[in-house]
């Protein structure tokens, strides 16, 4: 069977993964990874990663900067929409009542959804505005470190 290879797209995906990991986010690649991470006590920030421009230009940079704050989540994790489809679908099962959105952020406390920033809260905004939105959620739900 003939199979296309898209090295440029693969490079973009790998760069997007690397940026999230370098910012301190743990990759969740399987549904089991998601369940294990979301069972951890405390607060968890979930970055629903994507290859779109607003993910690379706004969401990932905002995620990297937002966590340098007096109050921040206990755990930082990421799933990759369109890539790790089963893991992303499992994560979205925890976001009860929220439509699928990527990129996006979900803040969980003890495995329960507290708040969500959707693509429309990210796209068209400056990264600093998204940082401020995330840090406002940290102020409300997270402990000082």
UniProtKB/Swiss-Prot annotation:
One of its GO terms (biological process) is cell redox homeostasis. Gene3D superfamilies: Glutaredoxin (3.40.30.10). It holds the Pfam family Disulph_isomer. It comes from the Bacteria. Belongs to the bacilliredoxin family. PANTHER family: BACILLIREDOXIN BRXB (PTHR40052:SF1), UPF0403 PROTEIN YQIW-RELATED (PTHR40052). This is Bacilliredoxin GK2368. It comes from Geobacillus kaustophilus (strain HTA426).
